[in-house]
Amino acid sequence: MKLRMDDLTWQEIDGELVILDLQGSVYLTTNAAGAFLTKLLTEERSEGELTDALIAEYRIDRETAERDVDAFVAQLKDQDLLA
């Protein structure tokens, strides 16, 4: 999966990310982990790769990382932000 780049703009503020979809008028804010995952999704990534990266970056257990990645990906899909 990969972030849909057309008509998206974002700004990082104090470690959080604000994403604006100019096409669909979608406004999304993320925490630091969401900002980290969003940046990874500028290139094609699997959920497993995102999970592994989250574990390495934040030193959390696999179950927590999988749950967080699943929730974040679901949110991006709901907002039609994935290519």
Feature locations, PLM:
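Long, charge-rich, low-complexity alpha-helical segments
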Residues: I13, V26-A83
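Long, low-complexity, charged/polar intrinsically disordered regions in eukaryotic proteins
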Residues: M1-L22
